A protein has these predicted regions:
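Amphipathic coiled-coil/heptad-repeat helices and related helical stalk/stem segments
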Residues: 7, 56, 84-88, 112, ...
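Short, small/polar residue-rich loop motifs at catalytic or cofactor-binding pockets
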Residues: 27-30, 152-153
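Short, basic/aromatic recognition patches
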Residues: 6-26, 145
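Short, structured interface segments
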Residues: 129-146
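Active-site ligand-binding patch in enzyme domains
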Residues: 144, 150, 154-293
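Short beta-strand scaffold segments in enzyme catalytic cores
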Residues: 30-39, 157-158
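Zn2+-dependent cytidine deaminase-like catalytic core
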Residues: 35-134, 254
Length: 300
């Protein structure tokens, strides 16, 4: 392989490593890193969850020996600022890494381009943009939050072969297969928040949670809920309120209520217009709560 092909190969490998954090890294991006010297992989790492070591730190640590004059591959620009963990820039510089290949810059204004410049000032060769589009797709929710000012949104819809989404008599009934329901469970696990409506909750009385045993072992917590309930008519004994370990945002146009909700229920006032709540105002609110991805499950 030539140098360009080699760079692409190892960046693709960082994508695979990054996926180890797909259920747990949120709200941080998924990041993988590899340290290579003379064609040999010295160390690999990935970011598992907030507060845990960053991928670059793990890769350098797992090398178990000097990484001087090596190349570090990482799918996202290394952090520059102090957060839950210290910035990786000093570690990379002090480790005397010779070259850093970055798939794409971090859209976070606290980071964007700053690490790139700092590394170059320290005499490290920096290459940016290898498989950039793939890297952005990998963390589409993270990029959406900073570039579009809203989370990435995925909508689920169960449709029969004749193009229907429910029975004509309004009775709730599964029209999806076991395989597709497992896909829904997986999408829920990948999303920090499920978005629905009062009509769906009242008609189907869903739990909107993760029940698949294998997925329960991988997630840190049940996804939060966002429900448009303009008049706060969802009964307090509904299944969605049974899981107390998650936040439930109720978007309503009612300023005060006598209903006694549990502490995990957050009432969010959104002024209605012509009897309807502006969904983009709900989405904007959720973006400010550090929600990168939203999975929409709502009927007609």
């Amino acid at each position: 392989m030539n140098k360009e092909e080699t760079d692409q190969y190892y960046i693709e490998e960082t994508f695979k490593l990054a996926l180890n954090g797909k259920f747990t890294a949120h709200p941080n991006p998924m990041v993988g890193a590899i340290v290579v010297k003379n064609g040999k992989v010295l160390g690999k790492g990935y970011h598992l969850r907030p507060g845990f070591p960053h991928a670059e730190q793990e890769a350098i640590k797992n090398a178990g020996k000097s990484v001087e004059n090596s190349t570090l591959y990482v799918n996202l620009e290394p952090c520059y600022h102090f957060g839950r963990t210290p910035p990786c820039s000093n570690l990379i510089i002090n480790s005397k890494i010779k070259r850093v290949v970055i798939s794409c810059l971090d859209p976070n204004p606290l980071v964007n381009g700053k690490r790139d410049k700092q590394l170059k000032k320290s005499g490290i060769e920096v290459k940016v943009g290898v498989l950039k589009n793939q890297a952005m797709r990998l963390n589409r929710g993270f990029f959406s939050k900073f570039l579009l000012k809203r989370p990435n949104i995925i909508c689920k819809s169960g449709i029969s072969l004749d193009g229907k989404i429910s029975l004509s008599n309004g009775i709730s009934k599964w029209i999806t297969s076991e395989e597709s329901r497992l896909d829904v469970q997986t999408e829920r696990a990948l999303s920090p928040l499920i978005f629905s409506s009062s009509k769906t909750v009242m008609m189907d009385n869903p739990s909107l949670n993760i029940r698949e045993p294998l997925l329960l072992k991988k997630i840190l917590k049940q996804p939060d809920l966002g429900i448009v309930d303009r008049t706060l008519k969802i009964p307090l004994n509904s299944k969605v309120f049974k899981v107390s370990s998650r936040k439930i945002y109720l978007f309503t146009s009612i300023k005060k209520t006598t209903k006694k909700y549990k502490k995990n229920v957050i009432i969010v006032y959104i002024q209605s217009r012509k009897g309807k709540i502006n969904l983009m105002e709900c989405i904007s609110f959720l973006a400010k709560q550090d929600i990168n991805n939203i999975f929409v499950e709502a009927g007609p």
